[in-house]
Amino acid sequence: MLRDSVGGVETRHLDLNADLGEEVTDDEALLAVVTSANVACGYHAGSVAIMRAVCEEAARVGVSVGAQVSYADRENFGRVELEVSAEVLEEQVADQVGTLSQIAVSCGTEVRYVKPHGALYHRVVHDEVQAAAVLAGSGSLPVLGLPGGLLLSLAAGIGRQVLHEGFPDRAYLEDGRLVPRSEPGAVLTDAETIAMRAVELALQESPELHSLCVHGDTPGAVAHAHAVRRSLEAAGFGLRGL
């Protein structure tokens, strides 16, 4: 959360992001609500044509673009951990970021941050080798991820901008990690509950969050995003992209 003060009145700012370009949701409808788009780079979902379509619309409506990098695993939608060497993973991340960057620039925008997807997102919370590979492959981009994990710790240690992310549509474990999707209740589906949870996360002081994510592949994602945005704005938050 960022704070601005104008005329003595403090405004709290937060980002609302969603995973896009995965061919499982209405990208255009979500881009009308969110402020940042985590764009699939072809390794778990998406294609050059889809990346271009998302980037064009994001540029048109003023939504920030981020590279959603993944294991090379379209069969499992990037949700299975893979044993990949650091060298290979670094090359794969660099390929994804580079491809999306070229497309984004051609559409009049740019890649503003990197965020791992699925199994890789959770792996780099505790795996130093893979976390370092993601950082090495993503240049100097700001890094969006789960607070308290190795990825963000390593990123901060080398001077990268670190962005803390929260998930109002997911259940949490006591240690701050997300409940695995395989467990009952891991994914929340009631829009009102998700919206209330979003405000709770936005107001928490430790860790302070920079962005909230609404999963684009969850049924009702567009309605969830609208509910979250309405609740955040009603709570006094201004929304802006990363």
What kind of region is each of these model predictions?
Residues 180-242:
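C-terminal alpha-helical cap/extension of soluble enzyme domains
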Residues 27, 46-59, 124-131, 148-155, ...:
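Active-site-adjacent beta->alpha loops and helix N-cap segments on the catalytic face
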